[in-house]
């Protein structure tokens, strides 16, 4: 099975399109919407690594969260207004296209993006919205980038992993443990 050879699997089921689409939407339009969401997801993950930031996230951070992590979820939210970052965070973790919630995730990667005028309080509240859903002992990696092209919008990208079966997670042999 595919899961047996992957570190992490993010599933976005096509049948969830019914939840976010008008009941009269044409199938071809629904699949275009699905493709757009997948494209945004790939751009979101690659943007985590390639977009320079105030607090950078690099490939090693992504690897830390996704290595042998089993199932993962990806959420991208965007919002405008006074509480744009917290609202974008809520949108990122509430997407009806996610196969699972991020509740109990053992690893979470968060990137908050906004213009130069994004307030520290907004960033802190957005991070709190997300981390409250994770496991109490989760590894949280945080990034903050500035993108003036967003105007007054804030965008939050979340990758949460480390729940569900993890077939590739290697268990240390007894000889590998250090004697203390």
What annotation goes with each model-predicted range?
Residues 1-180:
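Tubulin/FtsZ superfamily GTPase core signature
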């Amino acid at each position: 099975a595919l899961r047996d050879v992957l570190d992490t699997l993010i599933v976005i089921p096509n049948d969830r399109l019914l939840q976010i689409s008008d009941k009269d939407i044409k199938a071809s339009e629904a699949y275009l919407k699905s493709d757009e969401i997948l494209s945004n997801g790939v751009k979101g993950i690659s943007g985590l690594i390639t977009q320079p930031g105030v607090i950078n996230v690099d490939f090693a951070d992504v690897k830390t969260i996704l290595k042998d992590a089993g199932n993962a979820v990806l959420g991208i939210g965007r919002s405008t207004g006074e509480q744009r970052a917290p609202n974008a965070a809520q949108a990122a973790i509430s997407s009806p296209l996610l196969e699972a919630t991020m509740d109990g995730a053992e690893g979470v990667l968060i990137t908050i993006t906004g213009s130069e005028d994004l307030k520290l309080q907004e960033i802190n509240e957005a991070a709190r919205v997300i981390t409250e859903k994770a496991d109490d002992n989760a590894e949280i990696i945080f990034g903050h980038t500035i993108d003036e092209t967003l105007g007054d919008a804030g965008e939050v990208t979340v990758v949460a992993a480390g729940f569900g079966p993890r077939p590739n997670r290697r268990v240390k042999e007894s000889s590998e443990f250090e004697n203390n």
